Amino acid sequence: MPRLIAFLTALVLSIATPLTAFAQQNTIFSSENPPETTEEFVEVAVQGLVGTTTERRNAVDLLVAEGKSMIPTLVLMLNISGNHVNVAKGLKQLTGETLKDWRAAMLYQEAHPEIIPHPSYRGLKLRYFTSIDPRFMQFFPPQYSSRDKMKIRFEEIAWGGVRVDGIPSLDNPKLLPAAKAEYLRDDDLVFGVSINGDARAYPLRIMGWHEMFNEVIGGVPVALAYCTLCGSGILFETQVEGRDEPLVFGSSGFLYRSNKLMFDRATNSLWNQFTGEPVSGPLVDEGIKLKIRPVAITSWKAWREANPETQVLSLETGHYRDYGSGVVYREYFASPDLMFPTIVRDESRIKRKDYVFGIREFGAAKAWPLKAFEKERIINDRVGQTDVVLIGDPLTRTVRAYERGGRTFSMEKGVLVSDGKRWAVTEDALKGPKNKTLARVPGHIAYWFAWDGYLGVESALYDG
């Protein structure tokens, strides 16, 4: 935890650094000289950040006088300046609550979607973002970033501590045959992908630093979008109907409710990593939802033995990182705490950073706690009206799901059986007697808070 706290402290300091980039206008606003235009209200907020003690106090008073529409502005000011006493007092006046820091203020804001930001909010926030990285503007052109054009609340978009592509994607990275991957330990976890017989392994110790690969596997263009904060690596098909070329994704540097916002390089639309849908930009009204493909987290040893012809990601990524086992995000993964604020709706049965395996297919969604597989490796269940069987190993965070066609499966002496007949477990399907096959069902691992935050209202939770 001490290293996590140190990291968070450094992050807060880095967030506060752009304060020096806010140049104040010559005009000093007060009750005797109040702001009148949207642009002047932006300058009032700047005055509240960089003015003298009296000027800052006067600025907050002017913002508070405008009413609750200024709550998002004060929350942003708290983010930029740290726990500024005048801003905190202003928030208490408007909310009636003591919001001790930016995290608490963001949770309040998330819980109150009825609060519409003042028209000056956009200008202040873009000024803040561009002081960090001018390239951030490519995601928020005026014609696509108004409130009615976005699928998420602009006031809830938070800077994640890096610039555009500060977490670099791996695009068609160098691969090795399994026999040459001497850097890997048997117990290293990998994302295992197999499409049309083309098996690949992507170690989490590397992917944690990059959070995205764009590849063609088995002739299918795909991207693995890995949100380390959510514990979720989701494999998406990237060829979208109506587009000539597959989409290529990168990391924007932004978060929404502790989930990464990725972007496509063709249109600079922002996408929700968890849902595979555009939330801002030219593609937002195109009705696009990326198709999810199966992916399994498992140990390198288990993947290699099941897929001896597999290729695996090389350490030669073109980037310098510490790719050692268990290095990346070590403190965060070990902590029960979230790094960025978001409301956790329900922890009555499962804690926020407990792992679940989730499926959203067949017109329904359902999640299974990973710890459910401690009792039984095989779970016969259903998603919506479709029967499924899940095969799991909580020690390696591994779950694979398949349709079961009304059959009931069990594990006997390490062999999958139904009605006394053996079935082989492959990456594509279960294979049984008389060449019968049962298709693999796409799903993925995630922290509970992320699954519940994005799908909890419409999703069922296994309680067996």
How would you label these PLM feature ranges?
Residues 6-20:
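Bacterial N-terminal signal peptides
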Residues 41, 55, 70, 83, ...:
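Stable alpha-helical elements in mature extracytoplasmic
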